[in-house]
């Protein structure tokens, strides 16, 4: 089966900061005064892991450069708009796009402002016409040693925006360093707020981490 011939695709696992169209990265860099002294092929390599990569930490490094470009409301709205437009052109009818609001606050935005900017990009494309792509947003909490309060805010923002663009919360990041068990209370809180949950597990810590 040739996937290119299908026009009813669904994608349930997309990271906004890991799925940007190449032209979006180039345009954002130009707008922000960043000179990309590399070919398109070199830029794609900078943003992508090689085939067969099995190192989660190598995957995570590929998010670093896009994140530097995604620190303003305008940039975030554009990223979501451009990604959904590209997916729609590929025949995707429904997708769930995830990102960590706390990673986009380096220039002073609150997590709520980050979410509102991404939602603006979503609503500029999704559901505009009956045949338009439909999409949901998943808000990622991050594994780490000093961001417990930020994760709590993410869960509370998910509750605020649930059913209005946001459909779930997630846990992402360096699994081997920060086991899932450490976040039991956080996701008990999400359950208390009746927020659907998905968790990255088994990527670096084996099958036992999935059972956790």
Enumerate the language-model features and the residues they cover:
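Metal-cofactor-binding active-site regions of metalloenzymes
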Residues: 1-195, 204-211
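Cytosolic ligand/metal-binding cores
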Residues: 201
